[in-house]
Design a protein with these regions (language model features):
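N-terminal signal peptide c-region/cleavage motif recognized by signal peptidases
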Residues: 19-21
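Extracytosolic ligand-binding ectodomains
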Residues: 3-14, 24-381
Length: 381
């Protein structure tokens, strides 16, 4: 009689063993700039979370979402909390380059894969051992800077002025456009910086105009990119104005208003998927996301699509990791990292083909050039 409990207990144990390594929930931690200066990036990303499924490969997914308020210290705090308290298997975020750079320490120290939603190539620099655990979905600055320089050259631009954020995003873009401009035979004649929350850039713009460049590139992201644009318009600047893919969202158009007309920028193809030929590789995926997003939240944003691309990557990588380990373990996190590093999937922005030396994996298929015309994005063909 003493042993009557043993057989059902043994049966339960055997059933658990036969169920395989994937019996636990998969916890995905997300930290976004849902408030603060970068909120126009983080809000559509937060919205996109609501569109995602709660299971992958038959396993329950817990999306744990935090707001870092566009603050680097808060982003790192969130990352550490997600890892130590919520025991996440992977981190997605943050929305900006400075925040993502700050978070890397927590991801690397804990051996937790991280998918950044920010643009700078510094985040995944292959020469930095920290980046073994770090991936990202937005296009690298270098890829987009090359497209900007080619457009400038085609428009006859010989001299360029630059004004950008006084942080890692702005510094990264300045370095890349200098490289691309030199290749295109364009001389950078003036450089200025400003903070994301600066209410005015009058002094910087006056210095830029005094240098008489034929074009000016604004190295900014989100609605703060409108500040120099509006000042240039107020000063009646006649040259061409370029922006980065960091402003490709409806809030920028709303804030910049008519002062944005004529501005040129590179962006992911999903922003103007209707204007692409049916042969475009990402058109179908982009259309599916945009349709789903706009049905619930209104006008599309490239930034929400960056988060959706992170989901697409995970939807392919998680089934591979489940073959090797159980969620909630360091072995699963390592297997997930390995699977992400071997990604070859079509996203909303481009085709991700990753390897040990490239944790972004996007190429020319991930960029198009657009112009702002009457508060709309128009594809430059």
């Amino acid at each position: 009689m003493k042993c009557n409990w043993f057989l059902p207990a043994l049966g339960a144990a055997l059933a658990a063993m036969l169920a395989g390594p994937a019996a636990a929930d998969i916890n995905i931690g997300v930290t976004l700039a849902a408030t603060g200066p970068a909120a126009s990036l983080g809000i559509p990303q937060k919205n996109t979370i609501e569109l995602l499924p709660t299971s992958i490969a038959g396993e329950k997914i817990n999306w744990i979402v935090l707001d870092d308020a566009s603050d680097t210290t808060k982003a790192l705090t969130n990352a550490r909390k997600l890892i130590s308290e919520d025991k996440v298997d992977v981190i997605v975020g943050s929305s900006t380059t400075p925040n993502s750079l700050a978070m890397r320490e927590a991801a690397v120290d804990s051996g937790t894969p991280m998918i950044s939603l920010a643009a700078s190539a510094q985040i995944i620099n292959p020469t930095d051992p920290k980046t073994r655990w770090i991936f990202k979905t937005p296009q690298n600055d270098a890829l987009m800077a090359d497209a900007v320089a080619v457009s400038m050259k085609a428009n006859g631009v010989k001299t360029l002025g630059y004004i950008g954020f006084a942080d890692a995003y702005g510094d990264g873009w300045l370095a890349e456009i200098k490289r691309s401009a030199q290749t295109a035979g364009i001389k950078v004649v003036a450089e200025e910086k400003y903070n994301r929350n600066d209410p005015s850039v009058t002094g910087q713009v006056l210095k830029l105009i005094a240098a008489n460049p034929e074009a000016i590139l604004i190295g900014a992201a989100g609605t703060p990119g409108a500040t120099p644009a509006k000042e240039l318009a107020a000063r009646n600047y006649k040259g061409k104005v370029y922006q980065t893919h960091g402003v490709a969202n409806p809030d920028f158009l709303r804030v910049v208003g008519k002062d944005g007309n004529g501005e040129i920028l590179p962006t992911g193809p999903m922003l103007v998927y209707e204007q692409l030929p049916d042969s475009n590789e990402v058109k179908k995926t982009a259309a599916a996301y945009v349709t789903m997003y706009e049905k619930k939240f209104g006008t599309r944003s490239t930034f929400g699509a960056h988060l959706y691309d992170a989901y697409i990557l995970l939807s392919k990588a998680i089934p591979e990791a489940l073959k090797k380990a159980k969620p909630g373990t360091k072995e699963f996190r390592a297997a997930l990292r390995d699977a992400l590093e071997n990604s070859n999937v079509v996203g909303t922005h481009g085709v991700f083909v990753m390897n040990a030396n490239d944790h972004n994996g996007l190429d020319h298929r991930a960029r198009v050039m657009v112009k702002v015309e009457n508060d709309k994005w128009v594809l430059i063909k």
